[in-house]
Amino acid sequence: MYGFLSHLHCLLQVANLTVQCSAMVPCLSINSKAQSDCDCCARSKGCCDFVGSGVPTASIKIQCPVATATRRSSHQSAQLSEKTTREVGQRRAMASGETVVVTGASGFIGSTLVRRLLDRGYDVRAGVLNPDDKAETGHLHALAAGAGEGRRLHVFRCDLLDGAALLDAARGCSGVFHLASPCTIDPVSDPQKQLIVPAVEGTLNVLRAAKEAGGVRRVVVTSSNAAIMPSPGWPAGEVPDERCWTDIDYCEKNGLWYSVSKTLAEKAAWKFAAEEGLDVVVVNPGTVMGPIIPPAINSSMSVLLRLLQVHVEDVALAHILVFENPSASGRHLCIESISHWSDLAAKVAELYPNYKVPKFPKDTQPGLERAEVGSKKLIALGVQFSPIEKIIRDAVESLKSRGYIS
């Protein structure tokens, strides 16, 4: 899953671009003039909030005002349906006094989810890599204090391989949101050690802790569209949905180890849930708007040169709704639409004709139908997905507000 703002940044290159995220340097070939810890991306051990998003790892230490601005500007983007709006007050009352755990809380989705949970009345135990690192936790405390909810936010050290610590965090909680997952945008020398084992064992440790804690009624696992595709065997012309699973053999042959790790982790979660009787639901987001660039994709993987787009606020809301609604079950594909690079560039050029947006050749690969995707299960729960026009506008305006583009 690729960082949408980064792609827009690449599309909207202008001469006065003065501050450059180091994660984008390979793509833009522009030297970075300012670097410091990023306040929105998880770091250190490569543990992030997602979710299939190809997030920066320890090697990428950046000042990321874009993400901060994006969180701010996108605050109102995800809309509740009329029915859901009427239920907000009731659910806030229901959530009062409830405590939930969020792993990967300092990341892009995690931070948005924490804010929404606090707004809804939950006490939140926010799992981060280093609670003493202000660069990692400062924005969490700030958003809680700004909402007058500082006393209901509790930050704890979250090591996915430390089962005892996870159990301590889960005790007394009614729900667990598992977002953290190892990820890297760089080639890995040992996929098993660096990605697969931590992803699978980390997920299982969270589920074991939730089961042993006793009071957890539901666990929401953040998977990814990377666990849904690529799937070369999926019927041509049929848009992938929750029934589709990534072809692990295909990914292993093509070195797509992140997709392998997310797929195996989700399958392990479903196996554990079935064997142990734990209530687990899964959200599979597509491209979440954020300051991230994709790993290189070779020609044999041109099938992945499409973007499954979704607003970060929609993703956060989806997590809450599948937790709160007893009827929610199984996987929940969380995307607004499927589009190609050529479509994306054309839409940006249409909305912002003053920018010199590069043109991409029309996609001609078989099976790459342009299709609107209705994530029917989430829509039924009350999610109204932000249209691609709004996703683009929010992203571009965030870049403009921070001086990345004029």
Which sequence ranges carry the predicted segments?
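N-terminal Rossmann NAD(P)H-binding glycine-rich loop of SDR-like oxidoreductase domains
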Residues: S96-D123
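NAD(P)H-binding glycine-rich loop region in Rossmannoid oxidoreductase-like domains
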Residues: S111, L129-E201, A213
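Conserved Rossmann-fold NAD(P)-dependent oxidoreductase catalytic core, especially the SDR/UDP-sugar
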Residues: H178, P182, P187-Y258, V281
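Substrate-positioning beta->alpha
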Residues: N205, Q309-L321
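Active-site Tyr-X1-5-Lys
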Residues: C251-V280
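Glycine/proline-rich active-site loop of Rossmann-fold NAD(P)-dependent oxidoreductases
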Residues: E275-L278, G290-L304, V322-H332
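Mid/C-terminal beta-alpha module of Rossmann-like enzyme folds, strongest
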Residues: A316-L368, A395-L399, G403-S406
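Conserved C-terminal active-site "lid" loop/helix of NAD(P)H-dependent oxidoreductases
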Residues: T364-Q384
